[in-house]
Amino acid sequence: MAYCGGLDWGSAEHGVCIIEHDSGKVAAQFPVPHDAAGIADLMRRLARLAPPADLPIAIERPSGLIVDALVAAGHPVVPIHPNVVKASRPRYRAAGGKSDRGDAYLLADLLRTDGHRFRRLVPCSDEIKALRALVRGRDALVAQRLVLANQLRALLDSFWPGAAAIFADIDSPIALAFVRRYPTPDSAARLAEKRIKAFMAQHSYCGRRTASELLARLRSAPPGLAGDSEADAKGELVRALAAILTALVTQIAELTSRIEHTIGELPDGQILTSFPRAGRICAAQILAELGDVRERFPAEDQLAAEAGVCPVTHQSGKRRGVVFRWACNHRLRAAITCFADNSRHSSPWAADIYQRAKGRGCDHPHAVRILARAWVRVLWRAWQDRTRYDPTRHRGSRVSTA
C-alpha cells in the first residue's frame, strides 16, 4: 500500500502524519522530539510502513537536520511553500484553527492530492552547501556589524559627536582605533595636528584628508555637555563596542577572503564571475542560493520568480493589476539586483536597459529590477549550458553597442 507523509517542523518537536495514498486515511500520527533518539525512532517507524523510496514526505522547509536525515534515509522530500500551506488551511478548517497535528495532516494530504504540482527536493553538492554556509554566515555578521556601528555612532553623538564625524565610516579600522585611543572628549583635549599625523601614519591612513582637515572635523562638531562621570561611563561603553566591532570586522575580512577563494575554485563560480562587474562576493551570494542542480529551474521564468525580479499579475474580468512580488528568495533577489546595479557601470547593454526604464518613469529600485530580469535570462542560459558569459555571443549586447 502506498503512503504519503507530512512533517510539521518545530524547534523542539516535530509533528508527523502518514496517510494512505488512495483513501486519505491516517495510518500513523505521532510527535517526534528533535534529538538523536527521536530522529532515529522516526526512521524506524517510517521503515516499518514502507520502503523509504516509496514514502515521500512533505515539509514546509527545504533544509535542516531533519530534512538531511530523511534524504539520507532515501525518502523523497517535497518542500511546500508556507504560503501554499496557509492558503490551503480553509480547505480543512472553516474556523481557521491551527495545530501541529493538523498541519502535518494537511501537508500529507496536499502531497496526496496535489503532489504533481510540487517538485521533489534534489540536494546541492557538498561544495555548494559549504559556500552557502560561508555566505550566509558572512551576511549575518555584516548585518550585526551594521547594528553595532549604528549603536556606537548613536552613543558618540550623545556625548562626543566629533569622534563620530572625524572619519567617514565609524566601523572602519582607523575609526575604531581612534575611539579606542580617545574614547572621551577629555582624552583628546591635547590632540594636535602633530599627534593626528602620527596616528595616521601608525594606522596607514589612505584617505584623502589631511591631518589639519581631520582635526577641523573633530573641533567643528557640536560640543558634548555630559558631566565627567557620565562621559567616563560612556567612554567605557565606547571602548567595549569598539573592541567588539574590531573583532567582528576582522572576522568578516577573513570570511570574505575564504569566500573569494572558494568561488574561484568552483566551476559554476567561474561562470558567474565572468559576468560584468559581478564581483566574487556578489557571485558567491548568487551561487549560494542558485545552487548547482539544473533541474531545479528548468525554465528561466522560474528562476526570475524565485529571485523576485518579475512582478505578480492579478486579473479578474476587466480589472488587471501588476504588483511587486513579495514571496521569493530574498537573499537571491538582493544578490541579483546588486549585480545588476553594478553591471550598468560596465555593460553598455545593461546601462541602456536601465536608462530606458528610468525614461519610462521607473524609480531606481524598479529600474534595477527590470535590468535584473533581463540579466536572469542570460545568467540562466549560461548556467544551464555551463559556459562563461561572452558578450560577443550575447545578441542583445551586440545590438545595443552597434
Language model region names:
Residues M1-A402:
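A detector of single, family-specific signature residues
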